[in-house]
Amino acid sequence: MGHVIAMAGKGGVGKTTLCGLLIQYLCESGKKPVLAVDADANSNLNEVLGVEIGPTLGELREEIERAGADPKYQIPHGITKADWLEMRMSDALTETKDFDLLVMGRSQGQGCYCFVNGLVQTQVQKLQSQYPYIVVDNEAGMEHVSRGILPNLEKVLLVSDCSRRGIQAA
């Protein structure tokens, strides 16, 4: 069972940068492979880590939602949406030599991120036993932590600046 470390705090205080540095440190210390999870709708951990990504979980959600209504998003006949989504999940995992990256991303439409958050939770649970460390870059605030989206969370690094608002958010 991998150690789950999550970043939390106000937006713009360096959570993603610190997350990238922690992933680099773990990899250089031989604690690899690391599962990096970008659980922010405004995903950019891949840029910090210097990797190109495939489809995000949010994009897969869009494909499921539009299937049947938009010819561009078709699920093959004879397969359920749930089975198709399960099959496509591997496409959302970007693999490198030292770490793998799972990106939540955002959907194009309006609405709640509950389904995409559920996908993050499910994937982390499925993958957790394959990695000694899982490092999660969260969106601003504490919602991911307080809602229990991250299973078996061991450590939360609260990142802040010196402002009153930054400390209140952390």
Residue ranges and their predicted role:
Residues M1, G30-K31, E95-K97, Q128-Y131, ...:
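Short loop/turn elements that form and flank the Walker-type P-loop nucleotide-binding site
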Residues H3-A41:
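Walker A/P-loop phosphate-binding motif and the immediately C-terminal alpha-helix
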Residues I5, L35-V37, D100-L102, K155-L157:
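Hydrophobic/aromatic beta-strand patches that form the interior of the parallel beta-sheet core
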Residues K10, A39-D40, M104-R106, N138-E139:
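Fold-independent oxyanion-binding glycine-rich loops
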Residues L21, Y25, V48, G148:
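Active-site signature of alpha/beta-hydrolase-fold catalytic machinery across serine-
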Residues C27-K97:
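N-terminal phosphate/diphosphate-binding loop that engages ATP/GTP or pyrophosphate donors
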Residues K81-E95, D100-V136:
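Cytosolic-facing regulatory segments adjacent to core modules
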Residues F115-A170:
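Conserved catalytic-core segment of NTP-binding enzymes
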